Amino acid sequence: MSPRPVTITSYNMHKGMSALNRKVQVNRMADALGALGSDVLFLQEVQGQHLNRSRRTDFPDAPHYDIIGDSLDYHRSYGKNAVYPKRHHGNAILSRLPLKTENNLNISVNKLEQRGLLHCEVVPEGWEDPLVCLCVHLNLREPDRLKQYRAISDYVGRYIRPESPLIIAGDFNDWRQKSARELGRALDLNEVFVDNTGK
């Protein structure tokens, strides 16, 4: 059997809210993500709990990864990054393929931005090895991101076999595409958009 291709989508959910936090958008997000038909979803700023907002009639009690996972009938894994007394959010990986959670690594470099790397594996049909999926959310400031590139590279070098197929996806907060160059050089990875479009 020849290996089946895998499609992925990465999306920052903004904690399930619209711009300026005016409207709850979780169900619309679930519909839009479902319409894409991707095998694996890499999601950032996923609300796990928000006790204050859940008092609103339009804000769901259930974690947003469960709402989307139930809507699409996907397996799911959630890693808390930012934890407060009455709320928490983080990264999530959802998959139509069987999903195994390996680790949730704190890659925060300051007190203002709590960031993480969620490590899961999926086994696509016909593949010999599991596909390693790393979902990340990186800082806004470039000097902070440089530290986080090193943390990601160190983690991959330590825990991921060199022959393993690997996808690193997420919100890199990187408008100048330095993450692709830095991580590509350090880990011998290709940037999918550059491969597909040449830019």
Residue ranges and their predicted role:
Residues 40, 142-199:
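Metal-dependent phosphoesterases centered on the DNase I-like endonuclease/exonuclease/phosphatase
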Residues 35-37, 124-128, 158-164:
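Glycine-rich phosphate-binding loop signature in dinucleotide/nucleotide-binding domains
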Residues 15-18, 48-51, 84-87, 141-143, ...:
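Active-site environment of divalent metal-dependent phosphoester hydrolases
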Residues 69-72, 86-101, 199:
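Conserved beta strand-loop-helix elements of the APE1-like EEP
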Residues 1-71, 83-85, 129, 150-151:
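N-terminal, active-site-proximal structural segment of metallo-dependent hydrolase catalytic domains
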Residues 11-13, 46, 138, 165, ...:
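Active-site metal-binding loops of divalent metal-dependent hydrolases
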Residues 1-8, 89-91, 95-100, 113-135:
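Beta-strand-turn-beta hairpins that frame and shape the catalytic cleft
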Residues 79-84, 107-109, 196:
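Short, solvent-exposed loop/turn elements at beta->coil junctions and helix N-caps
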